[in-house]
Each structure stands twice: as structure tokens, then as C-alpha cells.
């Protein structure tokens, strides 16, 4: 299943994935907007960006592709992606933990799901530990994590493009830090995290 490899996971893992999707909307939204803001900043250095008539379309293209991998155009033409699901490359450095009440991070992530970034060291060993903590084999964990970021990103960004102009928000704040865009765009996604509302703008991502 090249477009949705998570459908091949064991049924129990698929059920947990469905639960996790609701639990990490805020975290994925913030990460996606931060990545889009950074990529738009890189694009602003291109000669074509000096043309004010092209800026909008350049940033719109960045936003359209932020939840997808390098095969975005190829997939849209009907071809299979090189990597199953064509997940965004920035998601490769993200892991997921399932928390329990009493865990140190639970108060900040009352949904029971926490995303984190791998920081240096042996990333593969870190993934194996995270997989073991969730009771998954490493292959299933990798599919689970990739699918989680991919599906949620496309929900909070792609499905909102008709109603919320993220590209315009980013274009208006290119010379600023992304925090204001994140607050403005992700407020609805983060509001449901009621227990963590006072601190939900700070996390490891």
C-alpha cells in the first residue's frame, strides 16, 4: 500500500494511530507551521522572490508541499512515491510516546500522546527504545510515527487551505520569528488541550 502503508499495520496499532491523531494535532500544527515559515524564509533569498507578484505563489507552493515528501508532483501525476506515503522529510526526526497518568509529561500532554525530536546520538537506538516502550516492533513503530505526522499534518494544513490562508500569514511575518504565526494559525488545534492551555506554546518540538 504505497499511499497508505499504515493500513498494513496490525489492527491494534491502527486503533492506537486513530487515537493518537486527535492527541497530537496541536503539536503537529506547530511543527508544520514552523517548518513552512523556515522554508519560506529560504525561498525569500531566491532572485524570483524580489518580484512582488511572484512572492505569494512561491509561499503558497511551500505551504502546499509542507505535509508531503519530495515526490509531491510525481504523486499528483498518478505515480507511486519513492517512500510509501510520501511523508514530509522534516517528520523523520520526530518520535512519539504514549503517556500514562503519573508520567512527568502527562500534565502538559493530557491527550496521552507526546511528540519529541531525536537529538544527536544513536537515533536508531533511540527509535528502538521508543518502539519498545509502545510495545511495537521497530518497523511498525516507524510506519506508525511517519503516518501520524503525515495524516495529522494534512488534516491541519491541507484541509484548511480553502478557509485559512497560512501562506499569507507567513508572508506577512517573514522577517519575524514564527511564534505569532503559530499562535494565530494553530490556536483552534491547541485549544482543546484544556489541561495544558497555559503552557501549550512550549514543548520539545
Indicate where each model-derived feature is located:
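Extracellular/luminal segments of secreted precursors and ectodomains of membrane proteins
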Residues: 1-205
Amino acid at each position: 500500500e504505497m499511499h497508505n502503508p499504515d493500513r498494513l499495520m496490525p489492527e491494534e496499532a491502527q486503533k492506537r494511530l486513530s487515537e493518537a491523531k486527535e492527541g497530537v494535532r496541536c503539536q503537529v500544527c506547530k511543527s508544520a507551521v514552523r517548518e513552512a515559515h523556515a522554508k519560506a524564509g529560504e525561498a525569500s533569498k531566491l532572485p524570483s522572490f524580489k518580484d512582488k507578484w511572484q512572492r505569494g505563489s512561491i509561499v503558497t507552493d511551500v505551504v502546499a508541499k509542507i505535509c508531503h515528501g519530495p515526490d509531491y508532483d510525481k504523486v499528483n501525476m498518478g505515480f507511486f512515491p519513492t517512500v510509501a506515503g510520501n511523508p514530509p522529510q522534516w517528520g523523520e526526526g520526530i518520535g512519539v510516546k504514549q503517556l500514562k497518568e503519573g508520567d512527568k509529561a502527562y500534565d502538559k500532554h493530557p491527550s496521552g500522546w507526546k511528540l519529541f525530536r531525536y537529538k544527536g546520538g544513536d537515533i536508531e537506538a533511540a527509535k528502538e527504545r521508543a518502539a519498545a516502550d509502545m510495545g511495537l516492533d521497530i518497523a511498525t513503530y516507524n510506519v506508525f510515527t511517519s503516518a501520524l505526522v503525515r495524516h495529522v499534518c494534512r488534516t491541519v494544513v491541507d484541509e484548511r487551505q480553502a478557509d485559512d490562508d497560512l501562506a499569507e500569514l507567513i508572508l506577512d511575518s517573514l522577517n519575524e520569528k514564527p511564534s505569532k504565526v503559530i499562535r494565530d494559525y494553530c490556536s483552534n488545534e491547541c485549544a482543546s488541550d484544556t489541561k495544558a492551555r497555559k503552557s501549550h506554546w512550549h514543548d520539545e518540538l
